[in-house]
């Protein structure tokens, strides 16, 4: 079974488990979810690298002061403690928190644990960071959970 099929099968099982009608990657290898109208998560299959990337939108870059970047860099220095790291998406203007799962480790249990860890940290950082006034743009994308 190719990796796209494996991920789509896993996402369908996950969708059924949490009560969604369906969930699968689009033709570009992406899927989006929105949790509690607060945290947008994009799933991106990097087939050539044999991994699934999870990206959680945390805040708008423009609402952050310079001091926060030191905290984010400090968190990244210890990425191995949480298997997460921060980055910036200049196209969307978002600070994002990233996790990845190697194809060899991709099971439903691993996916759910990684997603839960990502959501816990994203929600924690959202409480610490200034409020992002552009939540409507996130709400318009993906499947609501």
From Swiss-Prot:
Its main location: cytoplasm. Transmembrane segments: none annotated. The keyword ATP-binding does not apply. SUPFAM superfamilies: Type III secretory system chaperone-like (SSF69635). One of its GO terms (biological process) is positive regulation of DNA-templated transcription. It is found in: Cytoplasm. Part of the regulatory cascade that plays a role in the transcriptional regulation of the type III secretion system (T3SS). Interacts with antiactivator ExsD to inhibit its activity leading to ExsA-mediated transcription. This is Transcriptional anti-antiactivator ExsC. It comes from Pseudomonas aeruginosa (strain ATCC 15692 / DSM 22644 / CIP 104116 / JCM 14847 / LMG 12228 / 1C / PRS 101 / PAO1). The gene is exsC.
